[in-house]
Amino acid sequence: MYPHTDHQTSQPILDVQHLSFRYNGLFALEDITFHLHESERVAVVGPNGAGKSTLFKVVSGVLPPTSGEVNIFGSRPHGHVCIAYIPQRSQVDWNFPVNVADVVMMGRSAKLGPLNWPHKKDWDYVHHALETVELSDLASYQINQLSGGQQQRMFIARALAQEAELMLMDEPLNGLDTPAQEAILSLLDRLKKENVTVMVATHDLEQAANHFDRIMLLNHRIIAFGNPDRVLQTNNLLRAYGGRLRSANGENILTVDDCCDDGEHDHNH
Protein backbone atom coordinates (compact mmCIF):
# COMPACT_ATOMS: atom_id res chain seq x y z
CA MET A 1 0.00 0.00 0.00
CA TYR A 2 2.94 2.31 0.59
CA PRO A 3 5.01 2.06 -2.62
CA HIS A 4 8.34 3.79 -2.25
CA THR A 5 9.78 5.98 -4.94
CA ASP A 6 12.50 4.72 -7.26
CA HIS A 7 15.41 5.61 -5.01
CA GLN A 8 18.75 3.88 -5.16
CA THR A 9 18.69 1.73 -2.04
CA SER A 10 22.44 1.13 -2.26
CA GLN A 11 23.06 4.67 -1.00
CA PRO A 12 22.15 5.87 2.50
CA ILE A 13 18.59 7.03 2.95
CA LEU A 14 19.97 9.77 5.23
CA ASP A 15 23.47 11.23 5.01
CA VAL A 16 24.46 13.94 7.51
CA GLN A 17 27.89 15.55 7.13
CA HIS A 18 29.53 17.91 9.66
CA LEU A 19 26.19 19.34 10.75
CA SER A 20 26.21 22.21 13.25
CA PHE A 21 23.46 24.44 14.57
CA ARG A 22 24.02 27.52 16.73
CA TYR A 23 21.32 29.22 18.77
CA ASN A 24 22.01 32.51 20.58
CA GLY A 25 25.69 32.02 19.89
CA LEU A 26 25.87 28.55 21.46
CA PHE A 27 26.14 25.19 19.72
CA ALA A 28 22.98 23.11 20.06
CA LEU A 29 24.62 20.67 17.62
CA GLU A 30 28.29 20.54 16.73
CA ASP A 31 29.95 18.63 13.88
CA ILE A 32 27.37 15.83 13.60
CA THR A 33 28.17 13.19 10.97
CA PHE A 34 26.27 9.92 10.45
CA HIS A 35 24.23 8.01 7.90
CA LEU A 36 21.26 5.63 7.95
CA HIS A 37 20.21 2.88 5.58
CA GLU A 38 16.78 1.63 4.60
CA SER A 39 14.67 -0.02 7.34
CA GLU A 40 17.10 0.82 10.15
CA ARG A 41 15.62 1.64 13.52
CA VAL A 42 17.76 4.06 15.53
CA ALA A 43 17.23 5.45 19.03
CA VAL A 44 18.65 8.87 19.87
CA VAL A 45 19.37 9.20 23.58
CA GLY A 46 20.98 11.86 25.72
CA PRO A 47 20.25 14.26 28.58
CA ASN A 48 17.64 17.01 28.40
CA GLY A 49 18.91 19.85 26.25
CA ALA A 50 21.37 17.58 24.41
CA GLY A 51 20.05 18.59 21.00
CA LYS A 52 17.78 15.65 20.15
CA SER A 53 14.79 17.77 19.13
CA THR A 54 17.04 20.22 17.29
CA LEU A 55 18.67 17.37 15.36
CA PHE A 56 15.28 16.14 14.17
CA LYS A 57 14.17 19.64 13.17
CA VAL A 58 17.35 20.32 11.19
CA VAL A 59 17.33 16.91 9.50
CA SER A 60 13.68 17.33 8.51
CA GLY A 61 14.25 20.84 7.14
CA VAL A 62 12.22 22.65 9.81
CA LEU A 63 15.38 24.52 10.87
CA PRO A 64 18.29 25.46 8.58
CA PRO A 65 21.73 24.21 9.67
CA THR A 66 24.37 26.75 10.61
CA SER A 67 26.87 24.63 8.68
CA GLY A 68 27.13 21.16 7.21
CA GLU A 69 24.83 19.18 4.94
CA VAL A 70 21.78 16.94 5.23
CA ASN A 71 20.84 14.76 2.26
CA ILE A 72 17.84 12.47 1.89
CA PHE A 73 18.55 10.08 -0.97
CA GLY A 74 21.00 12.67 -2.28
CA SER A 75 18.62 15.65 -2.00
CA ARG A 76 18.22 18.40 0.59
CA PRO A 77 15.40 17.77 3.09
CA HIS A 78 13.39 20.94 2.53
CA GLY A 79 10.07 19.93 1.02
CA HIS A 80 11.18 16.30 0.66
CA VAL A 81 8.00 14.21 0.83
CA CYS A 82 9.91 11.08 1.85
CA ILE A 83 10.66 12.40 5.35
CA ALA A 84 8.12 12.84 8.15
CA TYR A 85 8.79 14.69 11.40
CA ILE A 86 6.53 13.70 14.30
CA PRO A 87 6.85 16.29 17.09
CA GLN A 88 6.41 15.81 20.81
CA ARG A 89 2.75 15.75 21.76
CA SER A 90 3.35 18.70 24.11
CA GLN A 91 4.03 20.90 21.07
CA VAL A 92 0.57 20.30 19.57
CA ASP A 93 -2.59 22.35 20.21
CA TRP A 94 -4.96 19.48 20.94
CA ASN A 95 -7.95 21.82 21.19
CA PHE A 96 -7.68 22.77 17.52
CA PRO A 97 -11.02 21.81 15.90
CA VAL A 98 -10.01 19.05 13.51
CA ASN A 99 -10.84 15.36 13.34
CA VAL A 100 -8.51 12.39 13.09
CA ALA A 101 -9.09 11.63 9.40
CA ASP A 102 -8.40 15.24 8.41
CA VAL A 103 -5.10 15.23 10.31
CA VAL A 104 -4.06 12.05 8.52
CA MET A 105 -5.09 13.61 5.19
CA MET A 106 -2.59 16.40 5.90
CA GLY A 107 0.04 13.81 5.05
CA ARG A 108 -1.20 13.92 1.46
CA SER A 109 -0.84 17.71 1.13
CA ALA A 110 2.50 17.62 -0.70
CA LYS A 111 1.03 15.15 -3.21
CA LEU A 112 -2.07 17.26 -3.77
CA GLY A 113 -0.45 20.60 -4.47
CA PRO A 114 -2.16 23.97 -3.92
CA LEU A 115 -5.94 24.24 -4.38
CA ASN A 116 -6.21 20.56 -5.20
CA TRP A 117 -8.90 18.60 -3.38
CA PRO A 118 -8.23 15.01 -2.29
CA HIS A 119 -9.18 12.28 -4.71
CA LYS A 120 -10.33 8.72 -4.00
CA LYS A 121 -6.71 7.53 -4.11
CA ASP A 122 -5.80 9.99 -1.37
CA TRP A 123 -8.65 8.85 0.85
CA ASP A 124 -7.62 5.24 0.19
CA TYR A 125 -4.20 6.06 1.62
CA VAL A 126 -5.80 7.74 4.62
CA HIS A 127 -8.15 4.85 5.34
CA HIS A 128 -5.40 2.26 4.98
CA ALA A 129 -3.12 4.26 7.26
CA LEU A 130 -5.86 4.45 9.89
CA GLU A 131 -6.39 0.69 9.60
CA THR A 132 -2.66 0.10 10.03
CA VAL A 133 -2.57 2.01 13.33
CA GLU A 134 -5.99 0.66 14.41
CA LEU A 135 -7.77 4.01 14.51
CA SER A 136 -10.41 3.47 11.82
CA ASP A 137 -13.23 3.55 14.36
CA LEU A 138 -12.02 6.94 15.62
CA ALA A 139 -11.63 8.65 12.22
CA SER A 140 -14.40 11.18 12.93
CA TYR A 141 -13.27 11.95 16.49
CA GLN A 142 -11.87 15.34 17.39
CA ILE A 143 -8.19 15.04 18.21
CA ASN A 144 -8.70 16.13 21.84
CA GLN A 145 -10.90 13.07 22.36
CA LEU A 146 -7.96 10.71 21.84
CA SER A 147 -5.72 9.23 24.49
CA GLY A 148 -2.01 9.97 24.38
CA GLY A 149 -1.23 6.68 22.67
CA GLN A 150 -3.99 7.22 20.11
CA GLN A 151 -2.70 10.72 19.39
CA GLN A 152 0.75 9.30 18.72
CA ARG A 153 -0.65 6.60 16.43
CA MET A 154 -2.60 9.26 14.55
CA PHE A 155 0.66 11.04 13.70
CA ILE A 156 2.19 7.76 12.54
CA ALA A 157 -0.86 7.32 10.30
CA ARG A 158 -0.28 10.79 8.87
CA ALA A 159 3.30 9.81 8.05
CA LEU A 160 2.08 6.60 6.41
CA ALA A 161 -0.43 8.54 4.29
CA GLN A 162 2.48 10.77 3.27
CA GLU A 163 4.32 7.62 2.07
CA ALA A 164 7.27 8.63 4.22
CA GLU A 165 10.38 6.47 3.99
CA LEU A 166 12.12 8.17 6.92
CA MET A 167 10.26 8.99 10.14
CA LEU A 168 11.75 11.18 12.86
CA MET A 169 9.76 10.65 16.06
CA ASP A 170 10.45 12.99 18.97
CA GLU A 171 9.74 11.26 22.32
CA PRO A 172 6.78 9.22 21.01
CA LEU A 173 6.74 6.99 24.12
CA ASN A 174 6.97 9.77 26.70
CA GLY A 175 4.05 9.91 29.12
CA LEU A 176 2.36 6.77 27.77
CA ASP A 177 1.36 3.78 29.88
CA THR A 178 2.91 0.38 29.17
CA PRO A 179 0.15 -0.94 26.81
CA ALA A 180 0.28 2.27 24.76
CA GLN A 181 4.08 2.06 24.54
CA GLU A 182 3.86 -1.57 23.44
CA ALA A 183 1.38 -0.61 20.71
CA ILE A 184 3.80 2.00 19.36
CA LEU A 185 6.73 -0.44 19.49
CA SER A 186 4.63 -3.02 17.63
CA LEU A 187 3.95 -0.42 14.94
CA LEU A 188 7.69 0.22 14.67
CA ASP A 189 8.17 -3.51 14.05
CA ARG A 190 5.68 -3.31 11.18
CA LEU A 191 7.34 -0.21 9.72
CA LYS A 192 10.69 -2.00 9.69
CA LYS A 193 9.17 -4.86 7.69
CA GLU A 194 7.88 -2.28 5.20
CA ASN A 195 11.42 -0.83 4.84
CA VAL A 196 10.63 2.43 6.62
CA THR A 197 13.63 3.93 8.41
CA VAL A 198 12.85 5.31 11.87
CA MET A 199 14.76 7.56 14.27
CA VAL A 200 13.23 7.86 17.73
CA ALA A 201 14.29 10.25 20.49
CA THR A 202 13.86 8.62 23.88
CA HIS A 203 15.02 8.92 27.48
CA ASP A 204 14.58 5.20 28.17
CA LEU A 205 17.96 3.47 27.82
CA GLU A 206 16.47 0.02 28.39
CA GLN A 207 13.94 0.44 25.59
CA ALA A 208 16.65 1.81 23.35
CA ALA A 209 18.79 -1.27 23.99
CA ASN A 210 15.97 -3.78 23.55
CA HIS A 211 14.06 -2.40 20.58
CA PHE A 212 16.51 -0.59 18.28
CA ASP A 213 19.20 -1.68 15.82
CA ARG A 214 21.55 1.15 16.71
CA ILE A 215 21.77 3.88 19.32
CA MET A 216 23.06 7.42 18.94
CA LEU A 217 24.29 8.84 22.24
CA LEU A 218 24.09 12.61 21.85
CA ASN A 219 25.14 15.59 23.94
CA HIS A 220 25.48 18.39 21.37
CA ARG A 221 28.06 16.12 19.72
CA ILE A 222 27.77 12.42 18.97
CA ILE A 223 29.34 10.68 21.96
CA ALA A 224 28.88 7.21 20.45
CA PHE A 225 26.87 5.64 17.63
CA GLY A 226 26.54 1.93 16.96
CA ASN A 227 25.00 -1.25 18.32
CA PRO A 228 23.54 -1.00 21.84
CA ASP A 229 26.20 -3.12 23.54
CA ARG A 230 28.97 -0.88 22.26
CA VAL A 231 27.23 2.45 22.86
CA LEU A 232 25.76 1.82 26.31
CA GLN A 233 29.09 1.35 28.02
CA THR A 234 29.76 3.13 31.28
CA ASN A 235 32.48 5.41 29.91
CA ASN A 236 30.21 6.62 27.09
CA LEU A 237 27.26 7.17 29.42
CA LEU A 238 29.39 9.11 31.89
CA ARG A 239 30.58 11.38 29.07
CA ALA A 240 26.98 12.04 28.05
CA TYR A 241 25.21 12.22 31.41
CA GLY A 242 27.95 12.95 33.94
CA GLY A 243 26.70 12.96 37.52
CA ARG A 244 23.18 12.05 36.48
CA LEU A 245 24.27 8.45 35.96
CA ARG A 246 23.81 6.03 38.84
CA SER A 247 23.61 2.31 39.56
CA ALA A 248 20.15 0.97 40.31
CA ASN A 249 19.68 -1.01 43.54
CA GLY A 250 23.37 -1.79 43.79
CA GLU A 251 23.20 -3.84 40.61
CA ASN A 252 25.00 -3.33 37.34
CA ILE A 253 22.01 -1.55 35.87
CA LEU A 254 22.71 2.01 34.85
CA THR A 255 19.91 4.54 35.02
CA VAL A 256 19.74 8.25 34.44
CA ASP A 257 18.55 10.87 36.90
CA ASP A 258 16.99 12.85 34.07
CA CYS A 259 13.45 14.16 34.17
CA CYS A 260 11.50 13.00 31.16
CA ASP A 261 9.71 16.29 30.80
CA ASP A 262 7.39 16.83 27.88
CA GLY A 263 9.63 19.27 26.10
CA GLU A 264 13.32 19.10 25.45
CA HIS A 265 13.89 22.80 25.25
CA ASP A 266 17.12 22.92 23.32
CA HIS A 267 15.31 24.83 20.58
CA ASN A 268 11.55 24.65 20.34
CA HIS A 269 10.02 27.39 18.20
Residue spans for each PLM region:
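Helix-to-loop junction immediately C-terminal to a conserved catalytic motif
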Residues: 60
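Conserved ABC transporter NBD signature motif
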Residues: 68-83
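Conserved ABC ATPase "signature" region
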Residues: 120-138
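Catalytic Walker B motif of ABC-type/P-loop ATPase nucleotide-binding domains
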Residues: 167-171
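ABC ATPase nucleotide-binding domains
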Residues: 233-235, 239-269
